[in-house]
Regions:
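Hydrophobic positions on the alpha1 helix immediately C-terminal to the Walker A/P-loop
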Residues: 478
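Extended, folded cores of ATP/NTP-driven motor/assembly subunits in large transport
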Residues: 2-427
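Conserved lysine of the Walker
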Residues: 475
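Walker A (P-loop) phosphate-binding loop of P-loop NTPases
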Residues: 472
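Conserved P-loop NTPase
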Residues: 781-835
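Hydrophobic anchor at the beta1->P-loop junction of P-loop NTPases
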Residues: 467
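P-loop NTPase motor domains
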Residues: 25, 35-36, 45-53, 59-78, ...
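A short helix-turn-beta junction within AAA+ P-loop NTPase domains corresponding to the substrate/partner-engaging
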Residues: 512-516, 749-764
């Protein structure tokens, strides 16, 4: 005898129920306008609610949310069912999109990396990642349709209740989904509930097609010729089988289910706001149902008063040493509490029942999860009971039809006032998951996949992102991980690395990118004086541009050069600025370039347009030496012409057509570093502006070098301008910094705050306590978030996007880890592996 069969035998059996078809078990008569008509004449509405990250809100915000929820409970339908369903995260759409993009990828290195990324998503999705859906279920309050309640009246009443719910849940921060086809959406919810296992392999649309084909074939109908016969809704959503023969579990669609309820007297005297979060986030295979029934206020007061009088009469005949005396005295005290709450605080009385559904693939796993759930609730001072020999009643109760079993209701119901009922607010398990985005990691609170699409203009006002973290928190690792995954999605990535640029080289080479080193003696050069064609043919076609009517390209370039020279010569006088401006115009004039835009082209009609030969710093140096007032500038510029940095005195010899480009500035020291960053930014910015139809991202590591105390206002303004306007060019500006004091060091932090305010997305890694307090107001962090951030381990972060915040554990595939790790032990292991492969 196998262990499984032995366990099942021990579980005990009862006489099998006579159930011919599973379709007959589902009490659905019709589904129209998103309203379910049940076989017993009730009308049900199911709404899906998007959760919020309740537990990361401040105490004040939590209180306001619960108050808004309590306000709605006062006017809500009398009977309510709140339902949460937990299941394995479905990453199929995201993976399918990645595979489709991989098919068009030309780089073999990128294809290989994409396969590793897909394996990571599958692995995390199958082992760790969960997703949760939340539902509000209410009904038309008349039990049966009568002459005075036609279907139009029923629809109108339910629609009004839905609109009220939307308004109040919006105050809580929750969005109620509005599907294009309410009937299809409701049917999909029911199909998912009854077919938890099958819905993974056979989506609802596939199930519908199969049922239609089978029905047509069974009735000898020809598809495309004969009309489709009427098919009951239950046929589309019914599971393949339901086994109701066991005392302590059922089997439905190949999964094992068991049911628990919190006893009516099994609650603690006080609970915290959001206490349901512990149940909701308990893990895989745990669903929660909360039933609320609001009592008539005037009748309740009369009943409570009558009960108090009766109990006081009984109490007089008892001795105070009796065991029942204390119980009766407590009942009287509770009665006064209810009466006072209703009369003085405008509260209602509710009857509440809470059910927990436990599911698993095997009986042993089911029993283990069930015990874990029982122990967890016990630790919260809540006591549960098993629905032994009542499994069918329990299943009918937790079905999304708002039909609680009277027997189970009697055992589980607990009377609560509005404030107590509001504490059951369960829509707290927020997920940040966009199928079109890139995976960042796993949500620490609920194990859901955290997939963020920075470029989703429907959700984000801009795609900008700030990365903040102390040294060693994983800032560079996270930036590279984000860049690699964007590259896999076909997004153009430019990385500017002013410090430790070598950390970016390995990943750049492995993905087939271009590594450009800007430094004295480097073979790479970007001519700072080059005027570039910044509009692609596609944008010329879209905008119908006429270059002759555009602002002067020469004037724009000179403006950029003035920023460059202000970084090089911070103490330049107004007179020197004027003389420099004139010298620049004369230098370009020698090459035939004027304020006439046509003058910058050698062949305007070529594809791409061919530009004239541009002057270099040496040409400007010659012009500066001719004027006594600019000789000081000429002396400083000579370093780039005849001195140690003469490698800057060349025509541009790098190509930015590669989709993954790293500009390494780490060899530039002192004053040369901000100058080099300006050269790199100027070049990249011109490329970004050329085509607004393509996604691109510019990533600036250690941005404090440009906007911090060691920079100047003009450079900071240029950098801020990028963050302000890059959205209009289809791009994202991503910055990273670890020195927060310098980040906010220029002009009392004006530029640091402005860049953060112009970035709707943030990744906050571990910060020191003083750093966290320093940016608390700027980042609008709560005390809870500050406490979490200061305790983060390496690779943990708080993701802030679209006014939502999620704590995540950042995940990388084996291939990505090898490409971007800087950990000494991991590098040593990689070296040994490569040496063994070489041998």
């Amino acid at each position: 005898m196998t262990k499984d069969s032995s366990a099942k035998r021990k579980a005990g059996k009862r006489k099998p129920e006579k159930l011919s078809f599973t379709q007959d078990f589902i009490p659905i008569k019709n589904l129209e306008h998103g309203i379910i008509e049940t076989t017993d004449g009730r009308y049900i509405k199911i709404l899906e609610i998007e959760p919020i990250n309740f537990m990361l809100r401040s105490e004040e915000e939590q209180y306001e949310i619960i108050c808004s929820f309590a306000s709605w409970l006062k006017i809500s339908p009398v009977h309510l069912q709140f339902k949460s369903i937990t299941r394995k995260a479905d990453s199929d759409k995201h993976i399918a999109m990645l595979r489709k993009e991989t098919e068009t990828e030309e780089s073999e290195q990128c294809k290989k990396l994409s396969e590793g990324y897909i394996r990571l998503i599958k692995d995390v999705g199958s082992r760790e990642a969960l997703t949760r859906r939340f539902f509000l279920i209410f009904r038309y309050e008349e039990l049966r349709r009568n002459e005075n309640s036609d279907y139009g009246q029923i629809c109108s009443t339910l629609l009004t209740a839905e609109q009220n719910a939307r308004a109040y849940f919006m105050q809580c921060g929750n969005n109620i989904l509005q599907p294009k086809d309410p009937d299809e959406a409701t049917a999909e919810i029911l199909y998912m509930f009854f077919n938890r296992r099958s819905c993974v392999e056979e989506p609802f649309h596939s199930r519908v097609d199969r049922i239609v084909l089978d029905t047509m074939a069974a009735k000898n109908k020809v598809i495309g010729i004969d009309p489709v016969p009427h098919i009951r809704m239950a046929h589309f959503i019914a599971p393949r089988g339901i086994d109701l023969t066991h005392r302590n579990y059922i089997i439905m669609d190949g999964l094992y289910y068991s049911f628990l309820y919190i006893k009516g007297n099994g609650y603690p005297n006080k609970v915290r706001a959001g206490w349901m979060s512990s149940l909701i986030n308990a893990g895989e295979g745990i669903d929660v149902d909360v039933f609320l029934k609001r009592e008539n206020r005037s009748k309740t007061i009369d009943k409570v008063a009558q009960r108090i009088r009766l109990n006081r009469t009984k109490l007089k005949s008892m001795q105070d040493t009796s065991t029942d005396y204390e119980e009766l005295a407590g009942s009287i005290q509770a009665g006064y509490f209810i009466k006072q709450g209703i009369a003085n605080y405008n509260e209602d009385l509710f009857y509440m029942s809470v059910f927990v559904t436990v599911s698993a693939r095997t009986y042993e796993e089911l029993m283990w999860r069930k015990q874990q759930m029982t122990d967890m609730l016990k630790s919260m001072d809540m006591y549960v009971s098993d629905c032994s020999f009542q499994q069918e009643d329990a299943l009918r109760t937790v079905m999304p039809f708002l039909q609680i079993s009277p027997k189970l209701e009697k055992k589980s119901k607990r009377n609560v006032l509005t404030s107590g009922a509001a504490s059951t607010y369960m829509f707290t398990s927020f997920e940040m998951s966009d199928d079109t985005g890139v995976l960042l990691g796993i949500n620490r609170h609920n194990n859901s996949l955290c997939i963020v699409d920075l470029f989703d203009t429907k959700k984000n006002k801009n795609a900008n992102l700030n990365l903040l973290g102390t040294s060693g928190a994983g800032k560079t690792f996270t930036m590279q991980l984000l860049a690699l995954r964007m590259r896999m999605r076909g997004i153009q990535c430019y990385i500017i690395a002013p410090i430790k640029g070598h950390e970016f080289r390995r990943a750049c080479n492995r993905i087939g990118g271009q590594f450009i080193k800007i430094a004295p003696g480097s073979p790479h050069c970007i001519n700072i004086m080059e005027i570039r064609h910044t509009i692609s043919p596609e944008m010329e076609l879209i905008d119908e541009l006429d270059y002759s009517e555009m602002d002067s390209l020469l004037a724009q370039k000179i403006q950029q050069l003035m920023i460059f020279f202000s970084l090089l010569i911070p103490d330049m006088t107004n007179e020197e600025e004027q003389m420099l401006d004139e010298a620049l115009i004369r230098t370009y004039g020698k090459f035939g370039i004027t304020h006439d835009n046509d003058s910058v082209y050698e062949d305007r009609n070529a594809v791409p347009p061919k530009m004239k030969t541009m002057p270099i710093l040496g040409d400007l140096h010659e012009e500066l030496q001719k004027n006594e007032m600019t000789k000081r500038i000429a002396v400083i510029v000579s370093r780039f012409v005849t001195g140690s940095a003469q490698s800057f005195n060349q025509q541009t010899n790098v190509d930015l057509s590669n989709k993954y480009i790293v500009l390494d500035l780490s060899e530039l020291k002192g004053k040369l570093l901000p100058v080099g960053m300006m050269i790199a930014l100027d070049y990249v910015w011109d490329k970004i502006k050329s085509d607004r139809t393509k996604k691109k991202a510019i990533m600036i590591d250690e941005i404090w070098q440009l906007i911090g105390a060691g920079s100047n206002r003009m450079a900071a303004e240029f950098c801020l301008e990028i963050f302000k306007v890059i959205r209009g060019f289809g791009g994202a500006a991503i910055s990273a910094t670890q020195d927060l004091s310098d980040f906010f060091g220029l002009e009392d932090g004006r530029y640091g705050r402005a860049i953060i305010n112009n970035s709707k997305n943030k990744i906050i890694l571990n910060l020191e306590p003083d750093e966290a307090e320093f940016v608390r107001d700027t980042l609008k962090l709560t005390k809870t978030e500050i406490r979490s951030i200061t305790r983060f381990e390496r690779g943990e972060a708080l993701i802030c996007s679209n006014n939502s915040k999620v704590p995540v554990i950042i995940k990388a595939s084996k291939e990505e880890q090898e490409m971007i790790t800087t950990d000494r032990a991991e590098l040593e292991a990689i070296l040994k592996e490569r040496q063994q492969e070489a041998d």
